[in-house]
UniProtKB/Swiss-Prot annotation:
Its main location: cytoplasm. The UvrABC repair system catalyzes the recognition and processing of DNA lesions. UvrC both incises the 5' and 3' sides of the lesion. The N-terminal half is responsible for the 3' incision and the C-terminal half is responsible for the 5' incision. Residues 14-91 form the GIY-YIG domain. GO terms for molecular function: DNA binding; excinuclease ABC activity. This is UvrABC system protein C. GO terms for cellular component: cytoplasm; excinuclease repair complex. Belongs to the UvrC family. InterPro entries: GIY-YIG_endonuc (IPR000305), GIY-YIG_endonuc_sf (IPR035901), GIY-YIG_UvrC_Cho (IPR047296), RuvA_2-like (IPR010994), UVR_dom (IPR001943), UVR_dom_sf (IPR036876), UvrABC_protein_C (IPR050066), UvrC (IPR004791). The keyword Nuclease does not apply. Interacts with UvrB in an incision complex. It comes from Lysinibacillus sphaericus (strain C3-41). PANTHER family: UVRABC SYSTEM PROTEIN C, UVRC/OXIDOREDUCTASE.
Length: 596
C-alpha cells in the first residue's frame, strides 16, 4: 500500500457509493459498490485475502470513489461503470450458451420463427427453450393453431401452407390488422401459460363442429388438442401454477461464486444457466451485481417474476428490474430456490478444484518465471518474432499472454516497412518501436515482460529502442532454440545470462508455449502475405486483367487454383467478356503445358 492510498483511506466517507480501483498505468481494473464506502474500501488493505483478491490488491496503485444517495443508486451506477470501463477483474465466467426462442416478427404481415438471437427490434420473444427440438415442436403446434404467413417474401400466388390451413395468404388477400392482433394476443396468452384456456376453446370448437356434422373439422380440432398434450407432457412439471419465472440460487467457496438460474416456463423447468466467477466483495453484493448484469443481456428476457434466496434484499432488485422479485419462505417455491442453491453448491465444489489447478499452473508459472529472473511476477507478457521468405515478404508478429494464458484479441501483425532485406535486427527494432510508440500514444497497458524470439543481439536492439529511445524500463528476455528448433534457454540480464529453469517445470512449459505461439502466428501471417503476392503476380501477368477484374475473378472462384481449372464458359459466367475469357483460359492452358 503506497502513501497515496493511505492518505485517501483516511478521508473515505461513511456513505453508499461506488469505488474504482486503478493499476500503475491508471487503468481501471475493478469496479465495486458499497453500503459504506469507508468500511468496504479499507477492507481491501487490511488483513489477509484469498489468492484472487490478493492478486487484485497487489495491482492497486490508486482508487477513486463516487458517493450515491442510496444502495439502489450505487447498484445502477456500478452496472453502468462496468459497462463503460469493462474492468478485467469484473469479468463474469459463464457457460456462453445460446438458447432457442420463438419470435413473432414486427412486420406488416408478422411471422412466427425460431431464433437464438434476441434483438431490440420491437418483436415479441418467448423462451428460452431447452433445445431446438422443443422450440421447433412448439412452433409446429402454433403453426397449426394460428395461420401466420411463412414466406420471407410474399409470393405471387398461394403456397402449400395455405392449402394446409397454416397460412391466411396475405400474398393474395388483404388482411386487416385486427386479425393479426387477435392471433398474436392468443399466441402470447398460450406461450405465457394459457395452455388450458386454449385447449378449452378447441374443445368447444370440436364439439360444435361435431354437432354440425363437420367431422373432418372436428377431427382436426381433436388432433390439435392431442398435439398440445404431446408437446407439453414432454416437460417436467415443477410448479403447480403456470407463471413464467427465473429461480436463482448461489454458493461461494474460496473466493469463487457459482450462480445457477432455473428457467421455469408454464410451470415446467425447461433449462438452467450456470456461471462461475471470482468475487472481490461481499457475496450478497456480488449476487446483486450478477443479477443486474444477467438481465442486461438481450437473450435473457425478463420473466413475470424472479425468485432469489432469503439472504438477498429483493426490494433493490425489484426497483432495478421493474418486475416482481420474491424470496419464498416455504412450500414448493422455496424448494425451487433450495434446489438451485444446492446445484450451485455442487457445481462450485466440483469446478473449483479444476479452476484452482489451472490457476496454479498458469499463475504459478508466471510466479516461477518472476522468481527465477528476480522481477515482479510477469502477469502480462508480450512476445515478438520476425519471419520472411528468403528475404521477401518480411513480417513481424506479437502475441500477448495474460495470467499465463493467450489473450488472442491483443495479438498484432506487422509488415516490415523500413528494415533492409535479411536485416533481422532492423526488423526487431522496427516492430518494438512501432508497438511501444502506439502503447504510449494510446495509453495502453505496458507489459511486465517483453520476450524476444532470439538471442543476445535481438535483446540488445530491443533494449536500445525501449530504454534509449522511449525511456521505458521493461524487463527484456530472450528465447534461444536448439538445433531441432525447440526452446532451449531463457536469457536475461545485462549482459544476458542463461536463467536456470527445469525443462519439466511449469515456467519452462509456459515459455515453450509462448515461443511456439508467436512463431505460429508469425509464420501464418507470412504465408498469407506470400500467397497474396503470388496470387497478385500470376493474375497481373495476364493482359486485360486489371485490378477490378482480378477482384471479380477471386470473389467468384475463391482462389487462383479454381481460376486455373475454370472453363471458358465458367469464366464468362464470372463476368468476363468472351474474348477475355478465351484469353485467360488459353493463358492457363499454356502455363500447364509448359510445366509438363
Amino acid at each position: 500500500m503506497n502513501d497515496l492510498i493511505k492518505r485517501k483511506l483516511d478521508i473515505l466517507p461513511d456513505q453508499p457509493g461506488c469505488y474504482l480501483m486503478k493499476d500503475r498505468q491508471g487503468t481501471i481494473i475493478y469496479v465495486g459498490k458499497a453500503k459504506v464506502l469507508k468500511n468496504r474500501v479499507r477492507s481491501y488493505f487490511t488483513g489477509t485475502h484469498e489468492g484472487k483478491t490478493q492478486r487484485l490488491v497487489s495491482e492497486i496503485e490508486d482508487f477513486e470513489y463516487i458517493v450515491t444517495s442510496s444502495n439502489i443508486e450505487a447498484l445502477i451506477l456500478e452496472l453502468n461503470l462496468i459497462k463503460l470501463h469493462d474492468p478485467k477483474y469484473n469479468v463474469m465466467l459463464t457457460d456462453d450458451k445460446t438458447y432457442p426462442y420463438l419470435k413473432i416478427t414486427n412486420e406488416k404481415h408478422p411471422r412466427l420463427i425460431t431464433t437464438r438471437k434476441v434483438k431490440k427490434d420491437k418483436a415479441k420473444y418467448f423462451g428460452p427453450y431447452p433445445n431446438a427440438y422443443a422450440a421447433s415442436e412448439t412452433k409446429k403446434l402454433l403453426d397449426r393453431l394460428y395461420p401466420l404467413r411463412k414466406c420471407v417474401q410474399l409470393p405471387s400466388k398461394v403456397c402449400l401452407y395455405y392449402h394446409m390451413g397454416q397460412c391466411i395468404a396475405p400474398c393474395v388477400k388483404e388482411i386487416e390488422g385486427h386479425v393479426y392482433q387477435e392471433m398474436i394476443e392468443d399466441m402470447t396468452k398460450f406461450l405465457n401459460g394459457g395452455v388450458e384456456a386454449v385447449k378449452k376453446e378447441l374443445e368447444v370448437k370440436m364439439l360444435a363442429a361435431a354437432e354440425n356434422l363437420e367431422f373432418e373439422r372436428a377431427k382436426e380440432f381433436r388432433d390439435q388438442i392431442a398435439h398440445i398434450d404431446t408437446v407439453m407432457q414432454k416437460q417436467k412439471i415443477v410448479s403447480s401454477d403456470t407463471t413464467n419465472r427465473d429461480v436463482f440460487g448461489y454458493a461461494v467457496e474460496k473466493g469463487w461464486m457459482c450462480v445457477q438460474v432455473f428457467f421455469v416456463r408454464q410451470g415446467k423447468l425447461i433449462e438452467r444457466d450456470v456461471s462461475i466467477f471470482p468475487i472481490y466483495q461481499d457475496p450478497e453484493e456480488e449476487f446483486l451485481t450478477f443479477v443486474g448484469r444477467f438481465y442486461e443481456k438481450p437473450e435473457h428476457i425478463k420473466p413475470k417474476e424472479v425468485f432469489i434466496p432469503q439472504a438477498i434484499d429483493g426490494a433493490i432488485l425489484t426497483e432495478l428490474l421493474g418486475i416482481k422479485v420474491l424470496t419464498p419462505k416455504r412450500g414448493q417455491k422455496k424448494e425451487l430456490v433450495d434446489l438451485a442453491t444446492k446445484n450451485a453448491e455442487i457445481a462450485v465444489a466440483a469446478k473449483f478444484q479444476l479452476i484452482e489447478r489451472q490457476e496454479e499452473r498458469t499463475i504459478g508459472a508466471c510466479e516461477a518465471l518472476g522468481d527465477a529472473m528476480g522481477i515482479t511476477t510477469p502477469l502480462r507478457i508480450e512476445a515478438f518474432d520476425n519471419s520472411h521468405m528468403h528475404g521477401t515478404d518480411a513480417v513481424s508478429a506479437m502475441v500477448v499472454f495474460i495470467d499465463g494464458k493467450p489473450a488472442k484479441k491483443e495479438y498484432r501483425k506487422y509488415k516490415t516497412r523500413t528494415a533492409a532485406k535479411h536485416d533481422d535486427y532492423g526488423a526487431m527494432q522496427e516492430v518494438i518501436r512501432r508497438r511501444y510508440i502506439r502503447v504510449l500514444k494510446e495509453g495502453l497497458p505496458l507489459p511486465d515482460l517483453v520476450l524476444i524470439d532470439g538471442g543476445k543481439g535481438q535483446m540488445e536492439v530491443a533494449r536500445e529502442v525501449l530504454e534509449d529511445e522511449l525511456g521505458l524500463v521493461i524487463p527484456i528476455a530472450g528465447l534461444a532454440k536448439d538445433d531441432k528448433h525447440n526452446t532451449s534457454q531463457l536469457l536475461f540480464g545485462d549482459p544476458p545470462e542463461v536463467i536456470a529453469l527445469k525443462r519439466t517445470s511449469d515456467g519452462f512449459y509456459l515459455l515453450q508455449r509462448i515461443q511456439d505461439e508467436v512463431h505460429r502466428f508469425a509464420i501464418t501471417f507470412l504465408r498469407q502475405q506470400h500467397e497474396k503476392h503470388a496470387i497478385q503476380s500470376v493474375l497481373d501477368q495476364i493482359e486485360g486483367v486489371g485490378p477490378k477484374r482480378k477482384q471479380q475473378l477471386l470473389k467468384h472462384f475463391g482462389s487462383v487454383k479454381k481460376i486455373r481449372e475454370a472453363s471458358e464458359l465458367a469464366l464468362q459466367e464470372a463476368g468476363m467478356p468472351a474474348n477475355l475469357a478465351s484469353h485467360i483460359y488459353a493463358y492457363f492452358q499454356q502455363e500447364s503445358l509448359s510445366k509438363e
